[in-house]
Amino acid sequence: MQPSRRAFLLGRRPVQTPWATFLQRLALLCQGAVRDLGEAPGLGPRAMLAPQREADVAHARALCAEYGVVLALDEAQGPFAPVNGPLLSVDPGRLAGLARLAGPTPRWRAQPGVPLAALAQAGLRQFDGLPGSMTLAQWLAAPAAWPMGRCADSGVLAVDLLLADGVEETLGPFGTDDVQPLRSATVQRLVPALFQLAAGELASACRAAPRWGARYRLDALAPEAPATVNLAHLVLGHGGTLAWVQGVTLAIGAAPTDSASADAAPPQAAALRARIKALFDPYGRFPELAARPDGDNL
C-alpha cells in the first residue's frame, strides 16, 4: 500500500509547515484575532494580529522569536527594507485605553491603539490637525520633526516598551533627580552604550547639520535647556523597528515646527541608524528602516 494511501486510511494528517504551526499556536495563545494574509510575492508569508490585550503581543513576540518571524507595527511609516521571510503585522486598534492620571499636572496614560482624535479631544494640543484615525503607536513611529534637542515638545513623558528579547521596561526621565530605576539588565547595558554613541563622531556630524537629520532621535540625550534627558524620546520616529510600544504617558505638548526631510540627513545618519538599531534589536525581531528614502512600506 502506498504511504499516502496508508496515511489517509489511518487518519493521519499531513505534516504542517512551520508557518501553519506558528499561526495555529498564535491563535491558541492570543485572545485577539489572527488572520492569514497569504504569501507576499517573492518575500514570504504574511499575517495580521489584532491583539485584545497587552499579553497577546508578548505571546506573539515569543512565538516570532521561536519561528523566525518579523513582528511589525501595522501601517507604520517607513520606508522599510524588504522583509524576506515571514512577517506578522500587529494592529493595536483594540488596545485603546486612555486615562487621565491623578495629580495637579495634566497627564494621561494611553495605550498604543488610541486614535489621535481622542487625544486631541482630551486636550493634548500636539495632536490637533493630525489624522484623527491614526493611532498613537503610528504617530510615535512616524518621523519626528521636532527641532534638534527639543524632543520634550512632543509631550511624551514615558514609554512602556516590549523589547526585542522580551524584556518589558519603562523609559522616562533620566537624571540625578529622577528616582525611577532601570529595572532590567538589558536596558542597563543599552543606555550607557547609547550615551557613548551620542558622544561619538557619527552623532556629532548629525548635530552639526541645520536640523537633526537621522531618523532615530539620539539628540534626545543632549536636550536643549531647560529640558533634561528623557529616554522615552529615543523612540520618537522609530518606525516600529526598535521595540513594541505598550503604553505612553503624555503631557500637553506642541506641534513640531520643523519638517522631516530626508534631504537634510548627513551621510553619517545611515551609519548612526544602523548602530542604534543593532543596540536595540540585535536579533532582527522587528523590521529595518531602508537605507534609501525610496524604500518600501510593509
Placement of each model-derived feature along the sequence:
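N-terminal basic/disordered segments at the start of proteins
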Residues: 1-44, 277-278
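General beta-strand structural signal in soluble alpha/beta enzymes
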Residues: 3-5, 9-10, 33-37, 49-51, ...
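Short cationic amphipathic helices and targeting signals
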Residues: 10-14, 44-52, 106-110, 251-267
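Glycine-rich N-terminal segment of FAD-binding domains in flavoprotein oxidoreductases
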Residues: 28-102, 106-112, 120-124
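Substrate-recognition/cap regions that form aromatic- and gly/pro-loop-enriched pockets
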Residues: 60, 64, 68-70, 257-268, ...
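FAD-binding subdomain of flavoenzyme oxidoreductases
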Residues: 124-255
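Activity-critical C-terminal alpha-helical subdomain
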Residues: 266-298
